[in-house]
From Swiss-Prot:
This is UPF0053 protein BUsg_314. It is a multi-pass membrane protein. Signal peptide: none annotated. The lineage of its organism: Bacteria, Pseudomonadati, Pseudomonadota, Gammaproteobacteria, Enterobacterales. CDD domains: CBS_pair_CorC_HlyC_assoc. Pfam families: CorC_HlyC, TerC. GO terms for molecular function: flavin adenine dinucleotide binding. GO terms for cellular component: plasma membrane. Keywords: CBS domain, Cell membrane, Membrane, Repeat, Transmembrane, Transmembrane helix. It comes from the Bacteria. SUPFAM superfamilies: CBS-domain pair (SSF54631), FAD-binding/transporter-associated domain-like (SSF56176).
Amino acid sequence: MEFFLDPSIWAGLLTLVVLEVVLGIDNLIFVAILSEKLPPNQRDKARLIGLGLALIMRLALLSLISWVVTLTSPIISNNFFSLSIRDLILLIGGLFLLFKATIELHERLENEDHENTENKNYASFWAVVIQIVVLDAVFSLDAIITAVGMVNQLLIMMIAVVLATILMLLASKALTNFINIHQTVVVLCLSFLLMIGFSLVAEALKFYIPKGYLYAAIGFSILIEIFNQIARHNFMKNQSRKPMRQRAAEAILRLMIREKNNNKNRIKTDNKAEIVLSSSLETETFKDEEKYMINGVLTLAGRSIKSIMTPRSNISWVNTEKTINEIRLQLLDTPHNLFPVCKGELDEIIGIVRAKELLVAIEKNIDVYTFASQIPPIIIPDTLDPINLLGVLRRAQGSFVIVSNEFGVVQGLITPLDVLEAIAGEFPDADETPDIIKEQNSWLVKGETDLHSLQQLLNTKELIKQDDCASLGGLLISQKGQLPLPGETIKINSFSFHIVNATEYRIDLVRITKN
């Protein structure tokens, strides 16, 4: 009992436990890396068995203290070097550590797939356990000799080794999980093992490297990695604040971006391998149409209804107050299949009719108002989001839906074709001209052109800063503060917008140049 009341005993025990843990950190790192080679359900078992056998081996070595001490006596000696059993063990262990760490580093640097658990070839369970025990034998030797040099009581040494091993067991799973989550730490740990293996070989050959240098290098590397992990954590935190859809869009768009210099600076070569690689890159590159469509799909949910719809000014509608002959001529001259039928003005919608069916009804002298009222319009608010709009269009069964504001004023209409154009680009009707015409060093653009489509064509994100503007004309009016006159030029970031044609109430045509 007096044995445990001695403060010096407790101080020696505490110091020895700390030293055993410090000396066991390199072993712990190697255990964590080896455990990853096993299936997830076997990792804990291998770790426990490996460290458990290592504990038994350390206790056995402690019980043979007198024999362990003699391991430092030279067995090979000449004028150039001398080697003891301890030196041989350190040499073999150091070389094995260098070999194993180099193989692991090669796999990491070659970027082999460590995440595909379905097709991953796992190592044998007992092969990993044996490696853990063998490496622990090398690391144990230093720990046991340190214990013998510090404390005289065998019981204290055994207690310290047991406590240190228990702490290592508790920390091993957390360390393994941390390394599995943070893959950059694996490369850092393997670099540590290379340093440790080199120091073991140097020590065995009597080239003494101060431990302080080794620990200082490891400590500094850990500090740099801590900064790296903090930076990565902050980056992920900032990314998590973005909507999931935006993050997915940015990630996919980054995959589609191709460096223009890769095409401009491509060097012609007769090397067959380089030709094959070049052609494969050509085939794997996203085409402009594919980029446009993928971007359209990913950004669809974030757009407003106004940016998708056919605006009020472009709606062809049938006025019941016109004569039958006027209505017949309108139906025959306009290349549309569906028409809203209204009484006097567009806001007084009676119904939606097909041109062919209405012509047949007129020939049968059926009243236009009565015929149109059989198919009432589907009206949606201009605040509806595009995702819910798709469900409404499905219920419309091939017809279109009318977009109205909170005051009941018709803003436009949307057909399934409008949604397709928002994704894949413009499909002009027979009576339409393209919204955007590419000139030599500029673009000739209609004022009613959708801003999202224009942004994609110009490959910029500088135009849409708020949701109030859906068209180019609306953007320029908002930028100017009033309706600009023909001949005026408005500059927005790196683009110049020259007003080619404008009326008293809208912008018709704009020429865009990049500064």
